[in-house]
């Protein structure tokens, strides 16, 4: 919030953000019990990281950005205006406990779009940088 306050209205052409969803993921048990997940479970359980941003955060984001893409936007529908254009990331994860896709809410005036790229969390990395599409 402090950083965004420094910028004038519509300073950025595009903001792409992936805020914490506020779903209490830090308190959940990971399904897969391999070593990597046990380490992640301990880290996230001991850190209060999954707190959803406030309405003020989104107001400030919209103020400084001409356009925005908010990953996990479906978790913030109570804080954002309805959107026409969503980006759907089909992760092609198959039959498991992970989400099949992620949704990004945008203020871009266009139709919803689907992006397909296999990703299964930390298990799909294989040297690929860990970023959203």
Q: Where does each model-flagged region fall?
A:
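Class I S-adenosyl-L-methionine
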Residues: 2-17, 21, 25-47, 62-133
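Soluble or luminal CAZymes and related metallo-dependent hydrolases
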Residues: 49-57, 133
């Amino acid at each position: 919030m402090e950083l965004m306050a420094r910028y004038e209205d519509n300073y950025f052409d595009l903001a792409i953000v992936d805020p914490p969803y506020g779903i209490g993921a830090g308190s959940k048990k990971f399904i897969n019990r391999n070593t990597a997940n046990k380490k992640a479970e301990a880290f996230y359980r001991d850190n209060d990281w999954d707190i959803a941003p406030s309405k003020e955060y989104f107001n400030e984001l919209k103020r400084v950005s001409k356009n925005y893409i908010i990953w996990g936007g479906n978790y913030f529908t109570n804080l954002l205006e309805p959107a026409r254009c969503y980006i759907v990331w089909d992760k092609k994860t198959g039959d498991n406990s992970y989400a099949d896709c992620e949704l990004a809410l945008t203020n871009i005036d266009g139709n919803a779009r689907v992006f397909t790229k296999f990703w299964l969390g930390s298990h799909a990395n294989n040297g690929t940088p860990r970023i959203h599409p």
